[in-house]
From Swiss-Prot:
Disruption phenotype: Strongly reduced nicotine biosynthesis but accumulation of dihydromethanicotine. Inhibition of jasmonate-elicited formation of anatabine and other pyridine alkaloids. The lineage of its organism: Eukaryota, Viridiplantae, Streptophyta, Embryophyta, Tracheophyta. This is Berberine bridge enzyme-like C-1. Involved in the biosynthesis of pyridine alkaloid natural products, leading mainly to the production of anabasine, anatabine, nicotine and nornicotine, effective deterrents against herbivores with antiparasitic and pesticide properties (neurotoxins); nornicotine serves as the precursor in the synthesis of the carcinogen compound N'-nitrosonornicotine (NNN). Catalyzes a late oxidation step subsequent to the pyridine ring condensation reaction in the biosynthesis of alkaloids. Disulfide bonds join C33-C90. Residues 68-244 form the FAD-binding PCMH-type domain. Its EC number is 1.1.1.-. Mostly expressed in roots.
Length: 562
């Protein structure tokens, strides 16, 4: 079988940045180019009436919707792969930076804003959201603009014994989620979402549509967990479906109480959860609790912290309850705490859509919704834990969490399949040796934006205080919880855009990006740089934490394998 390389007919000459004599001329040139190549679904700033509706529709983090944030010159919504290719090439012809948006959930807004001062456009993939399921091969093709919820729904309509291992957020775009790995409730059984990718269609900076064979194994390896916005645009993923029983068991058990009450539960959880059979996922999150003082402390046992233990078992309720009561009797799980349902109903159950749709929340078609109408400002950070927390570490986490009653603290258990898949199998590296991952998550309403610095400083302080208890050298992080505090590409991007200076600056850019690249990708960072240099040597697809290319060699850094 020959590799798939499709070149869409397109006649133009690439222009340098100096070839456009001004912003107005640049916009006119881009508009003309798009229209001449049958791309009509776009909105220009500030003249189009629906510009801000399109900008905000998929912008999930309202930190980046503020009026002082950089705005794209044009928002383009391609309707086909031909339009997507033409869009990429028109943007290159007119020297606009490209931001690619699937679901708009980037923790640092990289799919919707650009901070380096250059004019940019958003290529929004929301119109490219088809999902085609083939039960004979037990695979599905999902276009890059499809959300996780749309993929789940399409699979469930085709089969009640097939699933896809990915995250719990139904509106999250598959393009970015899978590109960063994609951990979820089935990951202890089947690995992350990117582990299930068997082929892909990638459009590169030259407008070539490349399948796995055409892009080569180095690039195919990189797009599976190496982070979004780096390699080109994923037009479609081919994913392997996994088999699940017709009935699974779920539960959410809250154990509110004092820090002294909660700490032993968390201590036991970290011993139990990573060592359960891989059919069982038992996560825990500290959910917001903001009670008046008389309710908080007016009981014999103060209610200071509320951990919620979330469980999914690929089997019947009787087995799930028996397993937990033997391994974790302190939870005191009752039969009434657990619910039997189908896998797709469990996806709905853990999506928290009941908070939005109320009594109709059991309708699985809600998983297809792209717009839920509920948006907030948020900031996230992440960690990996390799050795069990001491009680001092747990109390540190609880004390810091209590300082922000609207925040979440999420512990995701590893082990199971995550221990069995090599750290080098795909670009996502966080495997054997990790007990659990942590997500720190501060949230606030848009009307409270004046206090955003307080929330951000809180989460930074929390993160700093947890340093003695988490992984180190490097301190691991999850690229899907993008965190600009780890460092940013800025000045070197200007140099990398200019071919004449790229040779002298590329090694510096690679070493600068190592500061966060090795936190996200550990020993896989240098291989990602090589893949980037192969597929996008001119750094067309970039953002503030993207992988830089180089034409020179880099020093290899070796750390203990995860």
């Amino acid at each position: 079988m020959f590799p798939l390389i499709i070149l869409i007919s397109f006649s133009f000459t690439f222009l340098s940045a100096s070839a456009t004599s001004g912003a107005g001329e640049g916009v006119a040139n881009l508009s003309t180019c798009l229209i001449n190549h049958n791309v009509h679904n776009f909105s220009m700033y500030p003249t189009s009436r629906n510009y801000f509706n399109l900008l905000d529709f998929s912008l999930q983090n309202l930190r980046f919707a503020a009026s002082n944030m950089p705005k794209p010159t044009v928002i383009i919504l391609p309707n086909s792969k031909e339009e997507l290719v033409s869009t990429i090439l028109c943007c290159r012809q007119t020297s606009y930076e490209i931001r690619v948006r699937c679901g708009g959930h980037s923790y640092e807004g990289t799919s919707s804003v650009s901070f380096d001062g250059s004019p940019f456009v958003i290529i929004d993939l929301m119109k490219l959201d088809d999902v085609s399921v083939d039960l004979d091969s037990e695979t599905a093709w999902a276009q890059g603009g499809a959300t996780i919820g749309q993929i789940y729904y399409a699979i469930a309509k085709a089969s009640d014994v097939h699933a896809f291992s990915a995250g719990s957020g139904p509106t999250v775009g598959s393009g970015g989620h899978i590109s960063g790995g994609g951990f979820g409730l089935l990951s202890r059984k089947f690995g992350v979402a990117a582990d299930s990718v068997v082929d892909a269609l990638l459009i590169d900076a030259d407008g070539r549509l490349l399948d796995r064979k055409a892009m080569g194994e180095d690039v195919f390896w990189a797009i599976r967990g190496g982070g979004g916005g780096n390699w080109g645009i994923i037009y479609a993923w081919k994913i392997r479906l996994v088999k699940v029983p017709k009935i699974v068991t779920t539960f959410k058990i809250s154990k509110p109480g004092s820090k002294q009450y909660v700490a032993p539960l968390l201590y036991k959880w970290q011993i139990v959860a990573p060592n359960l059979a891989d059919d069982f996922t038992l996560g825990v999150q500290m959910i917001p609790i903001d009670l008046p003082a008389d309710m908080k402390y007016g009981n014999p046992t103060p209610i200071e912290i509320c951990p919620q233990f979330n469980g999914l078992y690929l089997g019947p309720k009787t087995e799930a309850v028996s397993i937990l009561n033997e391994a974790f009797p302190e939870l005191n799980v009752k039969n009434d705490d657990a619910k039997e349902m189908t896998w797709i109903e469990s996806a709905l159950f853990f999506s928290d859509l009941d908070n939005i749709f109320g009594n109709s929340s059991d309708d699985i078609s809600h998983l297809k919704e792209r717009y839920l109408g509920v948006k907030i400002c948020f900031k996230g950070k992440s960690d990996y834990v390799k050795t069990p927390f001491s009680m001092d570490g747990i109390m540190t986490a609880l004390v810091e969490h209590e300082k922000n009653p609207n925040a979440f603290l999420v512990f995701d258990p590893y082990g199971g399949a995550m221990d069995k898949i090599s750290a080098q199998a795909i670009a996502f590296p966080h495997r054997k040796g990790n007990l659990f991952a942590i997500q720190y998550y501060a949230q606030w309403n848009e009307e409270d934006d004046a206090k955003s610095n307080e929330h951000i400083e809180w989460i930074r302080g929390f993160y700093n205080k947890m340093a003695p208890f988490v992984s180190s050298s490097p301190r691991g992080a999850y690229v899907n919880y993008l965190d600009m505090d780890l460092g940013m590409n800025m000045d070197d991007d200007y140099l990398l855009r200019n071919a004449s200076s790229r040779y002298s600056s590329s090694v510096d850019a690679v070493e600068r990006a190592r500061a966060w690249g090795e936190k996200y990708f550990l020993n896989n960072y240098d291989r990602l740089v090589k893949a980037k240099t192969k597929i996008d040597p001119l750094n067309v697809f970039r953002h503030e934490q993207s992988i830089p290319p180089t034409l020179g060699s880099t020093q290899e850094h070796n750390y203990s394998s995860e």
